[in-house]
Amino acid sequence: MWICPICKTTNETNICRSCGFDLSKDYAMHRFLCQLSASGRKIFKPVQPGDNILMASSNTDYVFGRKMDRTKITTIYFRNKKENIGEDAWDVSEKQNGSIMAWTEENRDGFKDLYLAANGNILANKDCSKLFSGYEKLKKIVGLQYFRTDQTENMSFMFDYCKSLASLDVSHFDTSQVTDMLGMLGMFNNCERLASLDVSHFDTSQVTDMSYMFHECNGLKILDISNFDTSNVKNLSVPLSEYLAVPQEYV
């Protein structure tokens, strides 16, 4: 038995069942494990708010560093509090400091729900390429407002082949730093069930590649790209209007 130094919860396993602190982890913020004190508490430097940076996850054979079939996940939950952490939780922070924990739970449909939790907002990695690519059975993303993208430089194929995703709120996405050469290449490629998508606020002034950005988004009825700045786009492949299979409204 030990007492978590963060939330003071009594635990039996190495991972705190409330906040996800890992007793056996060599935390990057401290670099060594301290000896247990007489009170049973472990001392380490607390994670700072700016450390909630999510790891990159561009290998579609993995889910944030863990070998897993992405097509088995139907819902992704972003949480701004680390509580009720699952027993199979693993560290998905870029710095491996325990600031962001992930776990899965079986749902009623026989598939899995994926949870991502941190104390505060989750900061997107600079490289978000293929972050959600290949989640073909993914129906919804809950709590995406807790996911900040203001430091992200590459969003290529970010939601590629999310073929079952019926709605997606990216209205809060900050794309001002998207400067990578691939930029927004195939960002929403094959999101065929999306009926609407609000990208009207996207800052595309530094993006050089928008190829296949909305390719095969056959379900889209309304798409507002009137504010898109394509002055630096070197590769558009085909005009944006031709990505869409049905008549669209451009507000």
Task: Give the ranges of each region predicted by the language model.
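The −1 position to Zn-ligating cysteines in a subset of zinc-ribbon hairpins
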Residues: 3, 15
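Negatively charged
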Residues: 38-251
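Short glycine/proline-enriched coil/turn segments at helix->beta-strand junctions
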Residues: 12-14, 137
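Cys/His-rich microdomains that often coordinate metals
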Residues: 11-12, 23
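Cys/His-coordinated zinc-binding microdomains
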Residues: 8, 20
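Short linear functional motifs in flexible/disordered or boundary regions
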Residues: 16-19, 28-31, 140, 167, ...
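Short microdomains enriched in Cys/His and/or Lys/Arg
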Residues: 21-39
